[in-house]
A protein has these predicted regions:
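A short, conserved alpha-helix in the catalytic core of glycosyltransferases
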Residues: 131, 137-142, 147-173
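A conserved acidic beta->alpha catalytic loop
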Residues: 8-17, 32, 62
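Conserved donor nucleotide-binding strand/loop of the catalytic core
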Residues: 19-38, 42-46
């Protein structure tokens, strides 16, 4: 069973009304802008409280490819659930690698991905563009830090987990950002 939880972070452009017209979405409307860090914190806490087994975190402008979740679940099965998180390969709309969302093998070294790379590669840091993790990891390592507001929350959070857990980029799972 899969649900879509949306955190509407004080939008003022008609988003709340549009979301209200979508019967298959579960929405929470926050009355003040708490930044993307706060939104991710809120949404992940919500997913943990509802007791979902898995959480797939995405930025509001992420476009996962139709098989992206299937590829993440397949990698989870291959790894036997033994991972801190899984991340999708991030592409631009033209299909090239999105440099701002490259996963890292250390705080100072990006993973050199190409558009044609496949497989499951070790990573230490990833963005919230498409991050897949089990509820137990959120319970064990906590939530993103709200004080970052908009920058670096994802790098800190994924590194916090990868210090103790093996984490990966799943190259066959792609998302456009």
């Amino acid at each position: 069973v899969c649900d879509i939880l949306i955190v509407d972070n004080a939008s003022t452009d008609g988003t709340a009304q549009w979301l209200a017209s979508q019967p298959d979405l579960f929405c929470c409307h926050i009355d003040r802008n708490i930044g993307s860090s706060g939104g991710f914190n809120y949404g992940m806490r919500w997913a943990v409280e509802v007791e979902y087994d898995y959480v797939w975190v995405m930025d509001d402008d992420t476009l996962p490819q139709p098989d992206a979740l299937e590829k993440l679940l397949e990698a989870d099965r291959i790894l036997g659930g033994h991972h801190g998180w899984l991340s999708s390969k991030c592409l631009w709309t033209d299909g090239s690698i999105c440099p701002m969302n490259r996963q890292r093998v250390s705080p100072y070294k990006e993973i050199s991905l190409t558009e044609s790379d496949s497989g499951i590669l070790p990573a230490q840091m990833a963005s919230f563009v498409s991050l897949f993790l089990r509820r137990e990891m959120i319970l064990k390592y906590g939530l993103p830090i709200c004080d970052f507001f908009i920058w670096t929350d994802d790098w800190e959070y994924t590194r916090r987990i990868s210090r103790s857990e093996r984490c990966y980029v799943v190259c066959s799972s792609t998302a456009v950002h």
